[in-house]
Design a protein with these regions (language model features):
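Glycine-rich phosphate-binding loop used to anchor ATP phosphates in small-molecule kinases
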Residues: 82-99
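Inter-motif core of Ras-like GTPase G domains
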Residues: 97-118
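P-loop/Walker-type NTP enzyme "switch/lid" segment
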Residues: 11-83, 182-183
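C-terminal lobe/tail of nucleotide-utilizing enzymes
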Residues: 133-215
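A conserved segment at the C-terminal end of the G1
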Residues: 1-14
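Conserved nucleotide-binding/hydrolysis micro-motifs of P-loop NTPases
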Residues: 16-18, 54, 64-65, 95, ...
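Conserved C-terminal guanine-recognition region of P-loop GTPase G domains, centered on the G4
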Residues: 122-135
Length: 215
């Protein structure tokens, strides 16, 4: 939604080896370089970026980890892109692998995505704690795949307290979203769009209240 509202957005895939964002964006066949090439100075940083359309761009992850991928060098890599984009999202995998630690060192803020299940909440809490340990003070939470009918007895405040982060938004459990993503299409027109719009406005600094009917 940020990209659709005249914001240039760069997605950085931090899932070294798996590299999933190129599939989700439908640009796998156009992937040539990655941020590892930029860190190693094998290619100009601009050539590593793929234009996914509608102000959305991708910087793919490398296939293998290298000792050259230090927090300092990776932060320098990300710094090069700041003048060209309004938002840069470092999409880290679940768990606290090298991708997460590199992301934390290079980030000014952190958005943690969690579902309602207890395992996901525990992982989100651990990620929040470690993000702060690595110098990220602004940590926010997005609750994903929330079903009002199934989760009537769930107190969202309890999730917030357990994770220890401010709530940024709640994404409904929508088949439209996941069908589009799995098909390599960005689901711009889906039932969850209002939730994405509220989240994007909050990221832009707008004061969008949380209402029970939107949960």
């Amino acid at each position: 939604m940020l990209a659709l509202h005249d914001k240039r957005v760069l997605l950085v895939d931090m899932d070294i080896g798996v590299r999933s964002l190129d599939i989700l964006l439908g640009v796998s066949e156009r992937t040539v370089y990655n941020w590892g090439d930029v860190v190693k100075n094998n290619v100009d940083y601009r050539k590593a970026v793929i234009d996914a359309g509608r102000n959305l761009f991708l910087l793919p992850a490398p296939i293998d980890f290298s000792e050259e991928y230090t927090p300092e060098k990776f932060s320098e890599c990300i710094e090069k892109y700041k003048k060209d984009f309004d938002f840069i999202f470092l999409d880290s995998p679940a768990g606290l692998e090298s991708g997460f630690l590199l992301s934390a060192k290079a980030s000014e803020s952190c958005v943690i995505l969690s579902t309602r299940d207890n395992i996901s909440i525990r992982a989100a809490s651990y990620a929040c704690e470690n993000a702060r340990k690595n110098g990220v003070s602004d940590v926010r939470l997005v609750v994903n795949k929330f079903n009002k009918k199934l989760h009537k007895k769930i107190n969202v405040d309890e999730i917030i307290d357990t994770v220890g982060a401010r709530l940024l938004g709640i994404i409904p459990d929508s088949q439209d979203i996941y069908a589009g993503v799995n098909g390599g299409d960005i689901p711009y027109d889906c039932k969850g769009n209002s939730a994405f719009l509220r989240i994007s406005k909050r990221l832009c600094g707008e004061n969008i209240p949380f209402r029970a009917k939107n949960l």
